[in-house]
């Protein structure tokens, strides 16, 4: 419909809507009367469209109106507030682009309104007194970003690193003196006091250019593999220090790259140069809630994919750091610390071990710091992620002291995960003046409908007042934000993204966010994770195959007996297998896949179906939604008489065996299907494609970006059962007629993964962000300082009081059980006290100071 319209971005709805209303005045009067007839209310998009269609009797007129400009506006409206005689619309014409208008239902007059005015309108439905109070708390973070360049095109959202390089090139271009900020930044580079790249003798841009020219001419005359040590003394004579490269060739490339930047900066050279700058050696990653460990933790409360993500992330980042440091010609040992909570009651895990090496790394560790009760004792038991907020400020201070001790100084980059980790990362990055990145994983505001305006109803259980406040602080404090997909940031044409939902919203009685976060901010970046390629590798790599697991997998797939681990059987084991693996809930839609299969006779004749999901017995589950889905699975198997064609296996947590299971499915020339109603990213899609399985995945969410439909896999519409079943059946029919087609899709899927979805690509991109944004923040120092003061005030007057008002759930549980901590229950890292500099002692003292009391 949108393609038929001549609506331009420059035309505001407030300007164009009146003419459109006049052209269909009679019909729209009827429509708006229907809107206001039931009094004050909030209408969602579907309700708006239904009321519009009900107000039109003539079929031709209805089609004309719905397909026209007014229909387009209403179709693009995410919600509307009805306060008779007015209806206020929140219209989203494109990802990230919102406009608010108010229409009088009697005379159809239209008035453009601000986000703040719209939110006040909306608040009237929930707390009229607060909405009318001129002194209600209103926050506008966008007002402090007016001088910061922003993206303008929806298609550019998520490409922050690329555009920051363009902005920096523009700002530094022109006169030589405009390069002074870059020179000043290079002069700050050091590792434990040892200068890197240049020393203080180079104090002007012209001196730097001369030194670069002399050095480049010199190394050009050397054999390209000449080690740096052979010519280090000559470099120092010109004011150049270590960090340019490990060989003559590498040094020449870096010297030339900086010379090009100084001569005429362009985004490509700018990005390339900062990828080589030796600015990141020590990284701290926060993941606080749940049971963070390397074994026996998955499935425990608040513990899941985030743990797997971070452990894979750490391995990839350490490997990339080691390679960079070597290529920079440095002899430096990098360190990565994953900060999480120490839990004395560890439930058989290692969550009571203070310092634990990360497996398959050399210099990375998990550092666990305990929560403290109000009387200063270690909190023994797990605390829900929703009840964690009163502990975080003290946790940040205790963590800071530990970090400075172990790293013997400040980290170079801090990355937060989820609300709690992001808030603590914000506190420490501000305190230590360190570059900060954040990763949401999930934003709870988008999971619970109307959880902002109805926060009071949910606050006792979820404490969204604290959580949403913390999210706003960390989003706006962060130097860069890492996301997995475009849709996570800005959604699709029809649906806002998770971050976009935080653009303008209100929590009546608490706070109104006239601007929360703008998805056009260049801090947003897409860096998709990969799958662990030591586990998920192609089925064709026979020498790596885990053949000792094949008897177990054969039993899992083909044994005829029902057990507590699997039910159903496959009568014809020569058929290819359709495979799926996910949680057993409504959104993951495993029962939907079973229905697609059951309804399609052709598909059933061609292939078997194997699903790995949830529990098999509803009496063993405590999750209401899972119980419903278990019962539905049994009903579908009976209704479609799937005996002999389906195998249902309960959830599997052994990642190594799961990797070989994918490959065994590929051996049957089968396919993987991800049928979710919505999937934010789709890690199982990456895993399956890594193993060489042709993959069908939902077109709702991240998988639509991972797969190029019809080339590297296939999109399926999870709402259209018949269409989805036909699409899968057609693929297998084509493979039956032309066996090479299966190989073609499998190979294209592997190529897609290698080009876009590996941890190597991820680590390279994130470290480039850390290096580039470190300089970017120095270019915008004054604007950042103003915003940081604003955020500090907001933290102190809002978040602190909300967290203080929360009951400390963990403290209450501790009082009900036992007090004190048995020393033998906590494994403490042996102390190796190292001499501290005076500055380190000062920083450590500061890190350990108690939080000020707020009345």
Curated annotation (Swiss-Prot):
InterPro entries noted in UniProt: Glyco_trans_1, Sucrose_synth_GT-B1, Sucrose_synthase_pln/cyn, SUS_EPBD, SUS_N
Reactions that this protein is recorded to catalyse: an NDP-alpha-D-glucose + D-fructose = a ribonucleoside 5'-diphosphate + sucrose + H(+)
SUPFAM superfamilies to which the protein is assigned, alphabetical: UDP-Glycosyltransferase/glycogen phosphorylase (SSF53756)
EC numbers for this chain: 2.4.1.13
Membrane-related topology note: Peripheral membrane protein
Pfam families: Glycos_transf_1, GT-B_Sucrose_synth, SUS_EPBD, SUS_N
Subcellular location: Cytoplasm; Membrane
GO biological process, one term: sucrose metabolic process
Region listing for GT-B glycosyltransferase, in residue ranges: 279-758
Expression by tissue: Predominantly expressed in roots, flowers and immature seeds.
Taxonomic superkingdom: Eukaryota
Any GO MF annotation of the entry: sucrose synthase activity
GO CC annotation terms, alphabetical: cytoplasm; membrane
Alphabetic keyword roster: Cytoplasm, Glycosyltransferase, Membrane, Transferase
Known function: Sucrose-cleaving enzyme that provides UDP-glucose and fructose for various metabolic pathways.
Family affiliation: Belongs to the glycosyltransferase 1 family. Plant sucrose synthase subfamily.
Protein name in the entry: Sucrose synthase 5
Taxonomic source organism: Oryza sativa subsp. japonica (Rice)
């Amino acid at each position: 419909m949108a393609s038929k319209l001549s609506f331009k971005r420059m035309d505001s709805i407030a300007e164009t809507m009146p003419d459109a209303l006049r052209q269909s005045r009679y019909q729209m009067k009827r429509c708006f009367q229907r809107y206001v007839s039931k009094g004050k209310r909030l209408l969602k998009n579907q309700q708006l469209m239904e009321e519009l269609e009900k107000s039109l009797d003539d079929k031709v007129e209805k089609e004309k109106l719905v397909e026209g400009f007014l229909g387009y506006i209403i179709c693009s409206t995410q919600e509307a507030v009805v306060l008779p005689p007015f209806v206020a619309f929140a219209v989203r014409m494109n990802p990230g682009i919102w406009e608010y208008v108010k229409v009088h239902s009697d005379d159809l007059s239209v008035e453009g309104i601000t986000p703040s005015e719209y939110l006040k309108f909306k608040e009237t439905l929930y707390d009229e007194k607060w909405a009318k109070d001129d002194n209600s708390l209103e926050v506008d973070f966008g007002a402090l970003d007016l001088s910061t360049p922003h993206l303008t095109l929806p298609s550019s959202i998520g490409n922050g690193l690329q555009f920051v390089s363009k902005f920096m090139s523009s700002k530094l271009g022109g006169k030589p003196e405009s390069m002074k900020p870059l020179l000043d930044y290079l002069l700050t580079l050091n590792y434990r006091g040892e200068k890197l790249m240049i020393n203080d003798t180079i104090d002007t841009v012209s001196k730097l250019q001369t030194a670069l020219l002399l050095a480049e001419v010199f190394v050009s005359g050397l054999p390209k593999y000449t080690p740096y040590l052979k010519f280090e003394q000559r470099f120092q004579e010109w004011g150049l220090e270590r960090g340019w490269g490990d060989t003559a060739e590498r040094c020449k490339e870096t010297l030339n790259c900086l010379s090009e930047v100084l001569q005429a900066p362009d985004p490509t050279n700018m990005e390339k140069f900062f990828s080589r700058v030796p600015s990141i050696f020590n990284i701290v990653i926060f993941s606080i809630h749940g049971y963070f460990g390397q074994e026996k933790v998955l499935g425990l409360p608040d513990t899941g994919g985030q743990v797997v993500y971070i452990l894979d992330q750490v391995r990839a980042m350490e490997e990339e750091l080691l390679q960079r440091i070597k290529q920079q010609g440095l002899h430096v040992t990098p360190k990565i610390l994953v900060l999480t909570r120490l839990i004395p009651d560890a439930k058989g895990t290692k969550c009571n071990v203070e310092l634990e090496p990360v497996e398959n790394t050399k210099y990375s560790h998990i550092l666990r710091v305990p929560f403290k009760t109000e009387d200063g004792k270690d909190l023994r038991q797990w605390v829900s992620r929703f009840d964690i907020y009163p502990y975080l400020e003290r946790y940040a201070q205790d963590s800071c002291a530990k970090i400075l001790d172990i790293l013997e100084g400040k980290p170079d980059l801090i990355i937060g995960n989820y609300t709690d980790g992001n808030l603590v990362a914000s506190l420490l990055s501000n305190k230590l003046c360190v570059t900060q990145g954040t990763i949401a994983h999930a934003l709870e505001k988008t999971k619970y409908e109307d959880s902002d305006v109805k926060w009071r109803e949910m606050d006792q259980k979820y404490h969204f007042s604290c959580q949403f406040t913390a999210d706003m602080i960390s989003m706006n404090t962060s130097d860069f934000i890492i996301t997995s997909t475009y849709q996570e940031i800005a959604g699709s044409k029809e649906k806002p993204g998770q971050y976009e939902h935080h653009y303008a919203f209100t929590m009546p009685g608490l706070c109104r966010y006239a601007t929360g976060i703008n998805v056009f901010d260049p801090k947003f970046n897409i860096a998709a994770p990969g799958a662990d390629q030591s586990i998920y590798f192609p089925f064709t790599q026979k020498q790596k195959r885990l053949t000792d697991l094949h008897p177990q997998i054969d039993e899992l797939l083909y044994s005829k007996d029902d057990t507590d681990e699997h039910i159903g059987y496959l009568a014809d084991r020569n058929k290819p297998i359709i495979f799926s693996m996910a949680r057993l809930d409504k959104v993951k839609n495993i029962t939907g896949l079973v229905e697609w299969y059951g309804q399609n006779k052709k598909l059933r004749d061609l292939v078997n179906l194997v699903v790995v999901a949830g529990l098999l017995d509803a009496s063993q589950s405590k999750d209401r939604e899972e119980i419903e889905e278990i019962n539905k699975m049994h009903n579908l198997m009976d209704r479609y008489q799937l005996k002999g064609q389906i195998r249902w296996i309960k959830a599997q947590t052994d990642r190594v065996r799961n990797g070989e299971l994918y490959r065994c499915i590929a051996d049957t020339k089968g396919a993987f299907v991800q049928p979710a109603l919505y999937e934010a990213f789709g890690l199982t899609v990456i895993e399956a494609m890594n193993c060489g399985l042709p993959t069908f995945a939902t077109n709702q969410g991240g998988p639509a970006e991972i797969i190029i439909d019809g080339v590297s896999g296939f999109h399926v519409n999870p709402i259209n059962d018949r269409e989805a079943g036909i699409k899968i059946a057609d693929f297998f029919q084509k493979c039956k007629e032309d066996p090479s087609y299966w190989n073609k899709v499998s190979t294209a899927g592997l190529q897609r993964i290698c080009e876009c979805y590996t941890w190597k690509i991820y680590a390279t991109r994130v470290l480039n962000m850390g290096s580039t944004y470190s300089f970017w923040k120095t270019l915008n120092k004054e604007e950042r300082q103003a915003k940081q003061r604003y955020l500090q005030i907001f933290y102190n007057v809002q978040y602190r009081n909300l967290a203080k008002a929360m009951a400390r759930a963990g403290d209450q549980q501790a009082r009900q059980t036992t007090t004190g901590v048995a020393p033998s229950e906590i494994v403490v890292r042996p102390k190796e006290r190292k001499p501290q500099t005076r500055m380190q002692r000062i920083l450590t003292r500061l890190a350990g100071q108690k939080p000020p009391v707020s009345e």
